[in-house]
Amino acid sequence: MNDYIIRATAANSQIRAFACISTEIVETARQAHNTSPVVTAALGRLLTGGAMMGSMMKGEKDLLTLKIACSGPIGGLTVTADAGANVKGYANQNVVNLPPSPKGKLDVGKALDIGVLSVIKDMGLKEPYVGQTDLVTGEIAEDLTYYFATSEQVPSSVALGVLMNRDNTVRCAGGFIIQLLPFAEEEVIEKLEKKIGEITSVTSMLDKGMTPEEILQELLGEFGLTILDKIPTKFTCNCTKERVEKAIVSIGKKDLQEMIDDEKPIEVNCHFCNTNYEFSVEELKDIITRSN
């Protein structure tokens, strides 16, 4: 099944909701970066959240970046997504081994530890919007919930989950974001809080084979759910040799000449998808000639 996001409203548009299945996204990231299970879970949660948040943006060229800088062994995470829910990301450290959490789960909170979440929205204006909040738990879903409440003043419930197979491949991944709009009635707020408090974890829903539509129906069915849109989402990197060449030009002729003088090919790595691009000495000479 291909990954996708469902966009919906409920309670006469007092609630807006997103639910996502992201198993292929997270497995693609795991394969690209060869991550250990706790890193797969951390990166997978941020990729899932990023895909849904990307789909919230209006402009075709809008770009969202989620960055976590942290003191834990993972070192940090970076995810970018566009309005079409194309998403990519990487961890600073791909292999982290930690004992399970007290609940017997992958200890993402310990892998991240203390840190800061930055949300950067580039909407083609002079300056991008930047919102920053401290990590609350390092479990990512709670950290995004806190970001929405403090930086965007939108009461939200974010749930993100990644479940692994014994062979360390991704069994299932997904999540939801449910938000109360400013005119939500007190009765709706109380009922929704009660409902969210009753549900099992999002991973157990996904593990049962529940689709994003079924997850939203379970959560919001009694509020009068209206599904608005089904958006495909995937792990996509837009790096090309031409784009990498532009990056090489930007380092300046002096450094470029030093590379040529070394008489060895150079290899440039894309952090997001881990693709390596090799440039021979002849190609480097050609680049410097064309940049004159």
Swiss-Prot record:
* A Gene Ontology biological process term: protein refolding
Origin species, per record, is: Lachnoclostridium phytofermentans (strain ATCC 700394 / DSM 18823 / ISDg)
Q: Name one GO cellular component term.
A: cytoplasm
By sequence similarity, the record places it as follows: Belongs to the HSP33 family.
Which compartments does it reside in?
Cytoplasm
Tell me the disulfide pairings in this chain.
Answer: 237-239, 270-273
Gene3D superfamilies assigned? Hsp33 domain (3.55.30.10), HSP33 redox switch-like (3.90.1280.10)
Q: What is this protein called?
A: 33 kDa chaperonin
Q: What does this protein do?
A: Redox regulated molecular chaperone. Protects both thermally unfolding and oxidatively damaged proteins from irreversible aggregation. Plays an important role in the bacterial defense system toward oxidative stress.
